[in-house]
């Protein structure tokens, strides 16, 4: 069995150089509706409008319509959207890697995320590597407090968005958001073309809301907003924990080209107390100036560029591969699982479409 390893440590070797970054640009989009059914287009796009404060994030927990994530969707929706775009434009979507934003977030944050591990499956087809998360063993339902804290985040999103621009929304729609049933089945997903170093990427990922509206020119950046919740900062240790959370906040938004993050700070009882707007591009400098050294954005980018270049040299056409980083490990393993085929990574519909082009 072919097996290669990549050492994350020492991360000092990724310090200093300036990796070229291709600004993420949306090339397509798709939506899931309230029943989590797939649709091409932006039907689930939502518009940011700040909530009234204070707000009780516990409200409506007993009526929460929670997404059933037992079904493993692979990257089917992403591939279906790419195929539809190719049919419309008559051009093949060229990329070195096609994957979800979440997969790239794990790679980008790996130099400073010692505790968490990951497993991904990958295959190379027509010169493009496609990656998806290896389905983990399902954990038993969390304690009530864990489930409730997860709900707080969805509640914050619900009371912070509108399904139309604020000037088109009625006062009742704006003020009645706290009474809405929280449903996390509906999602708007952006598909972007970007690049890190010499690796061309096409990434798909959920976007919470837009600040204003989409520009008429597709080339222009979109004012996306990412919505996050965090505990109030009361002492130094709280700030350290928050800066560590900022690593993931930054990575997720950086990869999709989301320029602004709105953080809702809540108390221990789940009451939303204040909002803070963060510019994604300024977060690494903010963390660097704090002097705590919890993470460095340049090291993350340089590491990702080096790792992806190495990965392209390892995973060749044909067969399926596994990328694995064990918990508390500083080594990423890459090994071949099957010598031929694409496993269940690529849908039959996508394979059939590409075989005709």
From Swiss-Prot:
How is the subunit organization of this protein annotated in UniProt? Interacts with rat1; the interaction is direct, stabilizes rat1 protein structure and stimulates its exoribonuclease activity. The interaction also stimulates rai1 pyrophosphohydrolase activity, probably by recruiting it to mRNA substrates.
Q: Which of UniProt's keywords are assigned here?
A: Hydrolase, Metal-binding, mRNA processing, Nuclease, Nucleotide-binding, Nucleus, RNA-binding
Q: Which InterPro entries did the record assign?
A: RAI1, RAI1-like_fam
Look up the domain of life of the source. Eukaryota
Name of encoding gene: rai1
The record's principal subcellular location, in a coarse class, is nucleus
The organism that produces this protein has a lineage beginning with: Eukaryota, Fungi, Dikarya, Ascomycota, Pezizomycotina
Q: Which reaction equation describes what this protein catalyses?
A: a 5'-end NAD(+)-phospho-ribonucleoside in mRNA + H2O = a 5'-end phospho-ribonucleoside in mRNA + NAD(+) + H(+); a 5'-end (N(7)-methyl 5'-triphosphoguanosine)-ribonucleoside-ribonucleotide in mRNA + H2O = a (N(7)-methyl 5'-triphosphoguanosine)-nucleoside + a 5'-end phospho-ribonucleoside in mRNA + H(+); a 5'-end triphospho-ribonucleoside in mRNA + H2O = a 5'-end phospho-ribonucleoside in mRNA + diphosphate + H(+)
Q: Which GO terms describe its biological process?
A: cleavage in ITS2 between 5.8S rRNA and LSU-rRNA of tricistronic rRNA transcript (SSU-rRNA, 5.8S rRNA, LSU-rRNA); deadenylation-independent decapping of nuclear-transcribed mRNA; mRNA processing; NAD-cap decapping; nuclear polyadenylation-dependent rRNA catabolic process; nuclear-transcribed mRNA catabolic process; positive regulation of termination of RNA polymerase II transcription; termination of RNA polymerase II transcription, poly(A)-coupled
- The protein's name: Decapping nuclease RAI1
Query: Which EC number(s) are documented for this chain?
Result: 3.6.1.-
Residues the record lists as binding substrate: 189, 206, 228, 252
**Cofactor comment in the record?**
Divalent metal cation.
Which top EC class applies here? hydrolase
User: Family per UniProt?
Assistant: Belongs to the DXO/Dom3Z family.
Purpose of the protein: Decapping enzyme for NAD-capped RNAs: specifically hydrolyzes the nicotinamide adenine dinucleotide (NAD) cap from a subset of RNAs by removing the entire NAD moiety from the 5'-end of an NAD-capped RNA. The NAD-cap is present at the 5'-end of some RNAs and snoRNAs. In contrast to the canonical 5'-end N7 methylguanosine (m7G) cap, the NAD cap promotes mRNA decay. Also acts as a non-canonical decapping enzyme that removes the entire cap structure of m7G capped or incompletely capped RNAs.
A molecular-function term among this protein's GO annotations: 5'-hydroxyl dinucleotide hydrolase activity
